[in-house]
């Protein structure tokens, strides 16, 4: 785990301001608490504007893009998922289904409490000499738990995702495990022991779209991530996502996005809109 200010992060990064137009994809969690100015950041191809007191939570596998990091001050917290205790990970919703919206906007009564928790974590991280290493490490675990659970509490107020029908929650997790293996709703229904009608009804209630549309959206998102971040040809991405051919993948992608895979990739290598 690492905790630092955005200014420190910029100082440590030799090629700052980086290639701002280049999307990044990490295999760890990144929390950003904006403390001054306004930060603009893109996560999974959606732009977010963060005023002071707001948080951004970027999760492993998500593609993100800096836009104006020099115009804001922020506290950054980076951690691997295995640094979090299993109980906290479960309560905070780590690693379950599609990542929730990354923007968190605490109300005036919650914002200072969250900020204080983050500041305590930052202080402990920077003062490792004050305690024996086992105590220091234990404190980092506990203080990170506080931040994550408070943020998860905000998410639950705003989204109430876990109150969705159980068939949808199981389908959501099955899609995360298997979207590159099968694109057939019948296969998920058989695996989970539901009818396709039950899955579609539950997904409509929870997500506002059919089970097939939900699966297609997840495939499109992963395709966008691979196209934006990497350099693999469309044929390789097609195979990774379980399509029988690059042609089939190209038609699927264009039907859902209005662009060919290569046109989409090219659009992500230029400066995104503010």
Mark where each language-model region is:
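Ligand-binding loop in jelly-roll beta-barrel domains
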Residues: 61-84, 89
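Short acidic-glycine-tyrosine-enriched beta hairpin
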Residues: 45-59
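Amphipathic alpha-helical segments enriched in hydrophobic/aromatic residues interleaved with Lys/Arg
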Residues: 94-155, 173
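Generic protein-terminus/edge-of-domain signal
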Residues: 1-48
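Terminal helix-turn-helix DNA-binding modules in bacterial transcription factors
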Residues: 205-246, 266-274
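Basic, amphipathic alpha-helical hairpins
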Residues: 124-131, 150-157, 171-184, 203, ...
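Short hydrophobic/aromatic patch on the recognition helix
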Residues: 53, 199, 248-249, 253
């Amino acid at each position: 785990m690492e905790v630092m200010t955005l200014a420190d992060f910029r100082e440590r990064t030799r090629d700052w301001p980086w290639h701002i137009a280049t999307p990044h994809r990490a295999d760890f969690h990144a929390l950003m608490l904006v403390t001054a100015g306004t930060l603009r950041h893109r996560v999974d191809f959606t732009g977010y504007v963060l005023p002071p007191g707001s948080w951004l939570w970027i999760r492993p596998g998500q593609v993100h893009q800096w836009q104006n990091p020099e115009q804001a001050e922020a506290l950054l917290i980076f951690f691997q998922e295995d640094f979090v205790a299993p109980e906290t990970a479960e309560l905070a919703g780590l690693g379950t289904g599609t990542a929730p919206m990354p923007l968190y906007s605490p109300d005036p009564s919650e914002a200072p409490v969250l900020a204080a928790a983050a500041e305590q974590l930052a202080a402990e991280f920077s003062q490792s000499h004050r305690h024996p290493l086992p105590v220091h490490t234990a404190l980092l675990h506990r203080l990170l738990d506080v931040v994550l659970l408070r943020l998860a509490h905000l998410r639950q107020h705003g989204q109430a995702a876990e109150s969705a029908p159980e068939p949808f929650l199981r389908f959501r997790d099955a899609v995360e495990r298997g979207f590159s293996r099968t694109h057939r709703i019948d296969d998920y229904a058989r695996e989970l022991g539901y009818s396709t009608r039950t899955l579609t009804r539950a997904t409509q209630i929870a997500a506002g779209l059919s089970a097939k549309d939900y699966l297609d959206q997840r495939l499109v998102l992963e395709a966008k991530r691979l196209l934006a971040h990497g350099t693999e040809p469309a044929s390789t991405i097609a195979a990774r996502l379980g399509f029988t051919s690059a042609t089939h993948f190209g038609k699927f992608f264009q039907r859902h996005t209005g662009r060919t895979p290569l046109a989409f990739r090219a659009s992500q290598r230029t400066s995104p809109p503010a």
